[in-house]
Swiss-Prot record:
Catalytic reactions of this protein: AMP + ATP = 2 ADP
Free-text note regarding domains: Consists of three domains, a large central CORE domain and two small peripheral domains, NMPbind and LID, which undergo movements during catalysis. The LID domain closes over the site of phosphoryl transfer upon ATP binding. Assembling and dissambling the active center during each catalytic cycle provides an effective means to prevent ATP hydrolysis. Some bacteria have evolved a zinc-coordinating structure that stabilizes the LID domain.
EC id: 2.7.4.3
InterPro entries: Adenyl_kin_sub, Adenylat/UMP-CMP_kin, Adenylat_kinase_CS, Adenylate_kinase_lid-dom, P-loop_NTPase
Protein name: Adenylate kinase
Organism: Alkaliphilus oremlandii (strain OhILAs)
Subcellular location: Cytoplasm
Sequence positions that bind AMP: 31, 36, 57-59, 85-88, 92, 160, 171
A Pfam family recorded for this sequence: ADK_lid
Location of the region described as NMP in the Swiss-Prot/TrEMBL record: 30-59
Cellular component GO terms, alphabetical: cytoplasm
GO MF annotations, alphabetized: adenylate kinase activity; ATP binding; zinc ion binding
Stated role: Catalyzes the reversible transfer of the terminal phosphate group between ATP and AMP. Plays an important role in cellular energy homeostasis and in adenine nucleotide metabolism.
Length: 216
């Protein structure tokens, strides 16, 4: 199963990604992770990417595609993969399509998790994180039974500085402006499946599995 996962910040993408890779026995490929890996290992691609980042420049699409393509050629991707965080633009999507053709493979589906903007803001603004163990809670949907302390370790819960309405709204708007053309691109290829992310976690996953033509 060769998949791409799309979804705005706060849509629960990370949770669903973990379930998808476990069910289909495929690697979860996050562009952030493979960038960090290549830079840490000092690979040629890592050095190339770092040279742009050190200057405060965006890494060009061709370098990003090269790094992703290199990762997709690894042995653990033989039975598929879940791409997360790439592509972000139609130009990157076209470059990825070309790279996949060169590798004699193609995408199966692009999963687009949708949640209303108001609900995304509500989710982010109510999020609380433990300073000690990193556990995540929500004041409304998943509160700690210990109030301002973590259920798991008793650590202090705090709200991230960027989990405020203004910043979250801006993040969502940037995401939508980038991703709307991408959604249209994959829709025109009949590869897009849109999933309502405003349901219980297990319901969202069940809908993803059904959309991929599988059984739970």
């Amino acid at each position: 199963m060769r998949l791409i996962l799309l979804g705005p910040p706060g849509a629960g993408k990370g949770t669903q990604a973990a379930s998808i890779v476990e069910k289909y026995h495929i690697p979860h490929i996050s562009t952030g992770d493979i960038f960090r890996y290549n830079i840490k290992q000092g690979t040629e691609l890592g050095k190339k990417a770092k040279s742009y980042m050190d200057q405060g420049l965006l890494v060009p699409d061709e370098v990003v595609v090269e790094i992703v393509e290199d990762r997709l050629k690894k042995e653990d991707c033989e039975n598929g993969f879940l791409l997360d965080g790439f592509p972000r633009t139609v130009v990157q999507a076209e470059a990825l399509d070309k790279a996949l053709v060169d590798m004699n493979i193609s995408l199966d589906k692009v999963i687009n998790i949708q949640v209303d903007k108001e609900r995304l803001i509500e989710r982010a603004v109510g999020r609380r994180i433990c300073r000690e163990c990193g556990a995540t809670f929500h004041v409304q949907y998943n509160p700690s039974t210990k109030g301002a302390l973590c259920d798991q370790c008793g650590g202090e819960l705090y709200q991230r500085d960027d989990d405020n309405e203004e910043t979250v709204t801006r993040r969502i708007e940037v995401y939508l402006s980038e991703t709307t053309p991408l959604v249209e691109y994959y829709s025109s290829q009949n590869k897009l499946v849109t999933i309502d992310g405003d349901k219980k976690i297990n319901e969202v996953f069940a809908n993803i599995v059904t959309s991929l033509g599988s059984d739970l």
